Amino acid sequence: MLIQPSIALFEPDIPQNAGAIMRLCACLDLPLHVIEPCGFLLDDRKLRRAGMDYLAGVSMSRHVDWQAFEDSTPAHRRILASAHAEVLLPDFDFAPGDIIVMGRESAGAPDYVHQACQHRVRLPLVSGQRSINVAQAASIFAFEACRQLHWFSHLGDETRDDSIE
C-alpha cells in the first residue's frame, strides 16, 4: 500500500507561497498541514490568486499550533527542511507517510520545531547562498520524496490535461 508524503507549513508568512504550495499538493495528491498562526487569512486574495482553481483539490488540515499538529500526527516522521541541516536531500531516504515541514519565510523554524522533528535535511546550494524560496524548496523536497516512494506511479497519465500546450 502506498502512503504518500505530506507537507506541513509552519506559521507561513506569505500567502503567495502558501498558495503555490497548495497548488503543488493538489497536483501531486499530497496532504497539506497548515500550522497556525499564519501571517495572513487563509481566504486571502493573494493566496487564492497563487493557488488558482487548484485550492479546492487540496486535502488540507489546519492546526491551531505546533502542539496540535504533533498531537494529530504521532505516527509520522517529521522531516524539517532547514538551511542549517547537515544531511543533504540527495543523501536522505524518505519513508511512507513522512511529513516534510517547511519553516516560516521570515524566520525559518524555532528551536522547539528543530528538536521535535526526527530529521533535518537541506538542499545542496552553492557556497555562500543561504536559501531558496520556500515554495521552490517545498517542490524540490516533495518531488524527491515522491520519486523515492514511487508515488508518481499512483498518479498515472489520466491526470494530464493534453488540451494545455
What are these regions (language model features)?
Residues 1-165:
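Post-transcriptional modification and biogenesis factors for structured RNAs
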